[in-house]
Curated annotation (Swiss-Prot):
Protein name as annotated: Small ribosomal subunit protein uS17
A single Gene Ontology CC term: cytosolic small ribosomal subunit
GO term, biological process aspect, one: translation
Family recorded in the similarity comment: Belongs to the universal ribosomal protein uS17 family.
Coiled coil ranges: none
Protein's job: One of the primary rRNA binding proteins, it binds specifically to the 5'-end of 16S ribosomal RNA.
PANTHER family in UniProt: 40S RIBOSOMAL PROTEIN S11 FAMILY MEMBER, SMALL RIBOSOMAL SUBUNIT PROTEIN US17M
Signal peptide (from-to): none
InterPro entries with a match to the protein in the record: NA-bd_OB-fold, Ribosomal_uS17, Ribosomal_uS17_bact/chlr, Ribosomal_uS17_CS
């Protein structure tokens, strides 16, 4: 159980909630270019388990690494940090 605290935790935006109990989250990170020093934005999509289907498209959520739940799903929804504003 000591590994539990060392699991990766990411904050990202939900881009899809069309699957049952699954959301797709885009996590954006910035890295410094090695030669020129400019900050470059990288993004990566993760599928996360949403047991109660509470996250909606546009929400900012926090996800945590977990055991493999399917072939592509290795993260679990921890909390909805900020709900999307519907206009």
């Amino acid at each position: 159980m000591a590994d539990r605290n060392q699991r990766k935790v990411y904050t990202g935006r939900v881009v899809s909630d069309k699957m049952d109990k699954t959301i797709t989250v885009v996590v954006e990170t910035y890295k410094k270019h090695g030669l020129y020093g400019k900050r470059v934005k990288y993004s990566k999509k993760f599928k996360a388990h949403d047991e109660n289907n509470i996250a909606k498209t546009g929400d900012v959520v926090r996800i945590s690494e977990t055991r493999p739940l399917s072939a592509t799903k290795h993260f679990r929804l921890l909390e909805v940090v900020e709900e999307a504003v519907i206009i």
